[in-house]
């Protein structure tokens, strides 16, 4: 299986945390959570390779430093036929589809999983179980802890990725035929967008890079892994 992880430009990342963290602090946290997410993915034997999709050179440098392939996100150069700028979810889904097509053009028919880049409490065992469940075939999703978003999207066999990320993505993926995967995977289901999400991952236990970032922010979590 090939994992795809998308990361937007650091200057616009985690805007919902802007009330508590300045731009530099948010960028530091994003990079730390990405580092821990990639480390967890690397610990899962069922995942052979990883691609980070990003337009950001700092994110790309981190990915290269841990031996991950980078696909240059074409989203910043995408425009609609009427000249308007596409919505964020449109550019994200276009970038993911382009990356998936590139991967399969080079590697043939491979199973794919798109993972959120901000899963600092995810455990290798959780992802291993989700991969095993997804391999029964077709498209499937791990719904996030809010019940509305998507933490992971799988496309196995010859199934197209067909990403529907954006508001209410869990519903969008379900309506397009993706089946929900059932499992007690709190770390896998908890991506970080808000201060409440940060509290949740603190309680679950975060990876070392995220712990260090939170410590720098003087918000040391009570638990770590």
UniProtKB/Swiss-Prot annotation:
The reaction(s) annotated as catalysed by this protein in its Swiss-Prot or TrEMBL entry are: phosphoenolpyruvate + GTP + H(+) = enolpyruvoyl-2-diphospho-5'-guanosine + diphosphate
GO BP term, pick one = F420-0 metabolic process
**What residues does phosphoenolpyruvate bind to?**
150, 166, 169
The record's top EC class is transferase
Q: Which UniProt keywords apply?
A: GTP-binding, Nucleotide-binding, Nucleotidyltransferase, Transferase
Q: Name one GO molecular function term.
A: GTP binding
Note the InterPro entries from the entry: CofC, Nucleotide-diphossugar_trans
Check the record and name the Pfam families matching this protein: CofC
Task: Name the source's superkingdom.
Answer: Bacteria
The EC number(s) given in the record are 2.7.7.105
Q: Record keywords: Nucleus included?
A: no
Q: In which pathway does it act?
A: Cofactor biosynthesis; coenzyme F420 biosynthesis
Q: Which residues lie within the region annotated Disordered?
A: 167-186
Gene3D superfamilies per record: Spore Coat Polysaccharide Biosynthesis Protein SpsA, Chain A
State the PANTHER family in the record: 2-PHOSPHO-L-LACTATE GUANYLYLTRANSFERASE
What family is this protein classified in?
Belongs to the CofC family.
Main function? Guanylyltransferase that catalyzes the activation of phosphoenolpyruvate (PEP) as enolpyruvoyl-2-diphospho-5'-guanosine, via the condensation of PEP with GTP. It is involved in the biosynthesis of coenzyme F420, a hydride carrier cofactor.
Name of the protein: Phosphoenolpyruvate guanylyltransferase
Q: Which organism is it from?
A: Rhodococcus erythropolis (strain PR4 / NBRC 100887)
């Amino acid at each position: 299986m090939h994992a795809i992880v998308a990361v937007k430009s650091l200057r616009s990342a985690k805007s919902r945390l802007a009330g508590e963290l300045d731009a530099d602090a948010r960028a530091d946290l994003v990079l730390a959570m990405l580092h821990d997410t990639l480390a967890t993915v690397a610990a899962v034997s069922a995942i052979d390779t990883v691609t980070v999709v990003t337009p950001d050179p700092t994110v790309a440098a981190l990915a290269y430093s841990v031996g991950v392939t980078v696909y240059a996100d074409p989203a910043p150069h995408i425009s609609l036929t009427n000249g308007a700028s596409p919505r964020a979810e449109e550019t994200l889904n276009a970038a993911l589809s382009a990356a998936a097509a590139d991967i399969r053009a080079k590697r043939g028919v491979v199973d794919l999983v798109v993972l959120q880049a901000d899963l600092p409490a995810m455990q290798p065992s959780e992802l291993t179980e989700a991969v095993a469940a997804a391999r029964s075939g077709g498209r499937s999703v791990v719904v996030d802890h809010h019940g509305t978003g998507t933490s992971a999207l799988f496309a196995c066999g010859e199934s197209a990725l067909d990403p529907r990320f954006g508001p209410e993505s869990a519903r969008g993926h379900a309506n397009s035929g993706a089946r929900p995967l059932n499992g007690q995977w709190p770390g896998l289901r908890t991506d970080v967008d808000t201060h409440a999400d940060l509290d949740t991952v603190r309680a679950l236990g975060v990876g070392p890079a995220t712990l260090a970032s939170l410590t720098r922010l003087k918000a040391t979590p009570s638990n770590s892994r």
